[in-house]
Amino acid sequence: MRIAILSRGPALYSTRRLKEAAELRGHEVHIIDTLHCYMDITSSKPAVRYDGEELPYFDAVIPRIGASITFYGTSVVRQFEMMGTFVVNESVAISRSRDKLRSLQLLSRKGIGLPRTGFANKPDNIKDLIRNVGGAPVVIKLLEGTQGIGVVLAETPKTAEAMIEAFMGLKANILVQEFIKEAGGADIRCLVVGGRVIAAMKRQGAEGEFRSNLHRGGSAELVRLTKEERATAVNAAKIMGLNVCGVDVLRATRGPVVMEVNSSPGLEGIEYATGKDVAGMIVEFIEKNARPHRTKTRGKG
């Protein structure tokens, strides 16, 4: 097969591993810079152009779309969909998962376990907003943040009020969530491919750090999932309509709660922690499912 990887970083671990895994299985792989693609969207014959030429037909496209280029990146993915190319994660599913508020609303509607979450623009009663999610300590998140950036822990009511007021002053959209203390600064990243969890790791935040992101100095190790955790991850991926994703889960007293569904999960940490060929499993999924015009909208909302 001829496979395209949409990525701005050909040297990034995940991009390199996907390319290596596909080539090892005899496929032709092209790494394409998403922002350098351009399109004639009114043409009766949809195409994507790159470096002055029309791109050849690809049997499959693997989108590795960074959060900062979601709008343009999903437009490029959508153009490939119009051409009948099989895409690993479709454009609407990527957009759905990138909107933290929208994704939480959709997961909540389907009964997925979530931390109590508040959303407001300019509340006339900040104290009530904080009380409504269980009171301090609370976690305050920027809707546009990634890799733990824009996530702060407010340990007292006064600190929480001050932080919320500060974000409001910047006209920033924020989520206010209950702090799951019993998780102990750890979360579980479940890698879902084709409707099943193929790998899972426990990420532990650095000492004194409540965020478990590996980019923030956290560590990772192999973890055994419970049946409930596995089912939660699979259902969350299905609701988002994603074929390949990372589902981040916290172990709360009441059961697993989903923090985020990542449509472009990094492979380095989970491959090292589990020793599994995750990239190879993604390529295997493509081999089994890539057919022309097979992409269809999954998930709702």
UniProtKB/Swiss-Prot annotation:
User: Tell me, what is one Gene Ontology molecular-function annotation carried by this entry?
Assistant: metal ion binding
Residue positions annotated to bind Mn(2+) 1 are 248, 260
One GO biological-process annotation of the entry reads: protein modification process
Q: Which Pfam families match?
A: RimK, Rimk_N
Give EC number(s), comma-separated. Answer: 6.3.2.-
Q: Which residues of this UniProt protein bind Mg(2+) 2?
A: 260, 262
GO cellular component, alphabetical, reads: cytoplasm
What is the required cofactor set for this protein? Mg(2+); Mn(2+)
Write down the SUPFAM superfamilies for this protein, in alphabetical order: Glutathione synthetase ATP-binding domain-like
Q: Where does Mn(2+) 2 bind?
A: 260, 262
| Residues binding ATP, per UniProt | 141, 178-179, 187, 211-213
State the UniProt keywords alphabetically: ATP-binding, Ligase, Magnesium, Manganese, Metal-binding, Nucleotide-binding, Protein biosynthesis
Which annotated residues bind Mg(2+) 1? 248, 260
What Gene3D superfamilies does the database record attribute to this sequence?
3.40.50.20, ATP-grasp fold, A domain, ATP-grasp fold, B domain
Query: Is Transmembrane helix tagged as a keyword?
Result: no
The ATP-grasp domain sits at 104-287
The source's superkingdom equals Bacteria
- Hey, which family's this protein in? Belongs to the RimK family.
This chain belongs to the protein called: Probable alpha-L-glutamate ligase
* Annotated gene: rimK
